[in-house]
């Protein structure tokens, strides 16, 4: 919070929660943590763009669905920008992953950047 007060950003892009999901944390705890971050940003006057995260399908459909729903629910709850996940494209392509088979590589970062910029530019044009 002190950095928000110090720098007073007009826009904060939040990309968080994937590691918590990969560790099997309860979706409600992940949602609560993200909600706290969003509230801190909003209370300091910043607009929020939340990047939808995903986890691999081998975590099971029930957990994965609960995890994935967090981002839409928070977007609706706080009326913030939701940037759709690009991770389905990344997880399905080994050429876009680091050697660990989990983290996006440099090529994937370009896709993520393009998705973020595309969504933000469309949203800002609509204002």
Residue spans for each PLM region:
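Alpha-helical cap/lid subdomain in secreted, periplasmic
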Residues: 1-127
